[in-house]
Amino acid sequence: MTAKKTNELTSGRLSVQILLYSLPLIASNLLQVMFNMADVAVIGQFSGTAALGSVGSTTTLVNIFTGSLLGFGGGISVLAARYLGAHDWKDLHETTHTSLVLSLALGVFALALGQGFSPLFLRLLGTKPELLPGAVLYMRVYLLGMPGAALFNFGNAMFSAAGNTKKPLQYLTAAGILNIVLNLFFVIGLRWGVAGVAAASAISQTASGLLLLRALIVSGEEYGVTPAHIRLTRSKVSPLLWLCLPAALQNAVFYTSSLFVQAGVNSFDATMVAANAAAANADPLAYDVMAAFHTACASFVGQNYGAGNKERIRKSYHISLAYSFGVSACISALLLLFHRQFLGIFTSDPAVVQAGVTRLFVMGLSYPWSAFMDCTIAASRGLGKTMGPTVIVLLGSCVFRIIWVYTIFAYFGTIVSLYLLYIVSWFITAAFEIVMYRRYFHEQTSIFKKKPVVA
């Protein structure tokens, strides 16, 4: 590996580097949002309301599976970035190949679990009986792409750790275009309906994963993959699982807790439920753009921790936080300014638009503040600390929200009292995360006269 590539995150002007690193991630995340919207549009327009309802009823379950893989990949990126920063090529090589085996194992486990228990999971999630057959079919076909998705998240983690966020974007774009073409072919041409949309997703996920794996094999970089060396290295399994499993668990539980919020929304009339669904389309626009800066934070902190550069760790956190907050504030301002136009994309019913304005305003004023929670968690992970931040976010953003639904919301019974749980939980969680990060920062950087601890 060349020194230029290895030190890309450990030298240079941080404000420019973090922005350039994050822009391809932002594009990738927004592409995923648009491709998901395309899936919904195709099935809704050409297969009818029942098919759309079947696919829509799987959203939470799909998020649990994909979120777990995404969290696992985030842990891989942190450890790889640290070894890159420390120029520890032997440990990096072993981590790369052990990560590949573990990622594939998780993908196969998700596939097997979903194939066997999708009907049970969907019933537990309250899927309507008339939608259940289509939802089960969608899940079983969609989950065939889990090993491919695991490969993509592994490859994305390795390239991102090395500062190369453009390569995953290229393959994601190609896979997204393939997904749309296959959607149209399977749903319109072959009339496969729900199965067609799921098959298109599974094939495109597998294609993107295999392409990214091939790119790692032919890269010739220290973080690349050598097929003959693909094996588990026992000494790397524990550090990887310690970093990856809490992040995967956090994502899974986080999406599970959203069921209780949805139950609160469902207690209102159909207009409010539809309004919530329309306004909720703003969430990924804000969250996914912010997530790019949080990924950057973890990678920059991780590499500079490996390099023993205390000041760049501090600045990486502060600059990433400023970008995340600032960009989200701009998105929120646009949503508040053009709220009716935005909601009009998803519904033409004036009553639904009017009801959706409430959620859009409450959430629009809340989005930027989540940066203090998520970016701080990313910084702690960059320092190799995952269990503490995970426990805090599970208590603050999951357990607290469930308690809020059954106490504050139950008492006031208004939609605003339900939506306010987001910003309150973010403030509480962020406060504890910041205190914990400051402690981690001082603990971890105090050892820089020695070799950084990676376990």
Language model: regions and residue ranges:
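Helix-loop interface residues and adjacent transmembrane-helix termini in multi-pass membrane transporters
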Residues: 34-37, 46-49, 83-86, 161-162, ...
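Hydrophobic/aromatic residues in alpha-helical transmembrane segments
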Residues: 23, 39, 76, 117-118, ...
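Short alpha-helical transmembrane segments in multi-pass integral membrane proteins
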Residues: 1-22, 80-147, 189-245, 301-366, ...
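Small-residue-rich hydrophobic transmembrane alpha-helices
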Residues: 52-112, 149-168, 275-338, 370-393, ...
